[in-house]
Amino acid sequence: KKYLILCPRQMKPHVSEFLPTIECIAFNKRNLFEMLKVDKLLKKRMFDIGFNPWSNGLDSCYFISYCDKFLFYKDFDKPSIINHYQVVRRYLKLPEKDWVINELILKESYKKILICPQSTDTNRNLPGEQLDRLILDFQKMYNQPEITIASMDKSDFRDGCNKFILEKTAHSSEQFIDLIKKSALIVCSDSGPLHIALALKKDLLAFLRITVPDIIINSGSCLIINKL
């Protein structure tokens, strides 16, 4: 079987890291010439099945419509109450999996800690006061570890901590993945850094505001969930 993933440029480093054997084409949908190249490729290759998981955009719907068979994710019939990630498994016709949470026992020492306080949903951002408390706690518990804060919002940065400015570019994504690799403990409030950290088998603290269901983690993950 042959697969092709189409994605924005900032997502290609993630595909290359975790699905290195899969063909991936990154493009800017606001660039007409790049869109025409993808359009020409899809007409020539004639794929059998098209999916656009988690996407409701017209561009992704347009591209998968070139396949012999396709179903827009926005039109997928799903139960009114279902796990966010289980929806995609059903959409892609993947087998059901049991959901297991194994509590993580934190190590006695961490030298490098990465904190990602920002979420795509601003209501789920890590509050400033809690961020300050976390930094103080880590400094006491782990004898002044090297703490890095990664965010697009400069107000999240703190004196005494390294700062990493997240940007929507491929280079920034590559640097962010490398930063997670070099960190021993990851703290986040969003599923993006969460899944990257788990895929790289990093110790993780996830602070999640109310969602339904409350815990949405991959099977077999090791972490502590704190609901704000």
What do the PLM-derived regions correspond to, one by one?
Residues 1-228:
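Catalytic machinery of carbohydrate-active enzymes
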